[in-house]
Amino acid sequence: MQSNVIKIIIGASLLIGVGALYLLLSLKTPDKPLAGQVNIYEDNAEIGGDFELIDQNGELFNSDELKGKLSLIYFGFTSCPDICPTSLNKITKAVEILSENKIDIVPVFITIDPSRDTPAVLKEYLKHFHPKFIGLTGDEKQIREVADKFKVYYAKAASENDNDQDYMLDHSSFTYLMDKNGKYLKHFYLDSAPSKIMEFLKSN
């Protein structure tokens, strides 16, 4: 009897330990693929594509408008408490570094929360980052289609809150570098230094 109790205690301790380790790794690497995310690490992964959304001024925006320019594309949402603003600050710094080196690049923020992130909300939010930022929204179907093209994972986080408008989103956190033809070049993680983009462009 006593040995069975000990086995149960040991088993429970192992489960708790594994759960704690998983949580720690998830918090330390929020930009790695989450459950359900398509693997973008494969060399032959097709990332990106044409799209049409609405910008922060309420105007129709076609991805063709990015042709002829390098661009940095990030998917997030304005209610994101830490990962998104951290990423947008890094993109802002990267744009500044590239500008100092005479490299023109367009930063683009695409919301994954279109029901709350209206053009007006995006416009106000992006005032905190580089003035060149283009903010894009659309309906749920449009956003999902664009996110799928970029292999972006996102989903509503589980919550016990009954308020339909008070929710968080789990999402991957990559910054995509696209060439002047709108083709994917490379993606950068949350922990990548802004200077990494410059280093990549200089070596390629």
From Swiss-Prot:
Query: Record's family?
Result: Belongs to the SCO1/2 family.
This protein's source sits in the domain of life called Bacteria
Q: Signal sequence span per UniProt?
A: none
Residue positions binding Cu cation: 80, 84, 171
Cysteines joined through disulfide linkages: none
**PANTHER family attached to this UniProt entry:** ELECTRON TRANSPORT PROTIN SCO1/SENC FAMILY MEMBER, LINALOOL DEHYDRATASE_ISOMERASE DOMAIN-CONTAINING PROTEIN
Species of origin reads Rickettsia bellii (strain RML369-C)
State the UniProt keywords alphabetically: Copper, Metal-binding
Instruction: Spell out the InterPro entries in the cross-references.
Output: SCO1/SenC, Thioredoxin-like_sf
Annotated GO MF terms: metal ion binding
UniProt name for this protein: SCO2-like protein RBE_0699
Classification via CDD domains? SCO
**Pfam families the record matches:** SCO1-SenC (PF02630)
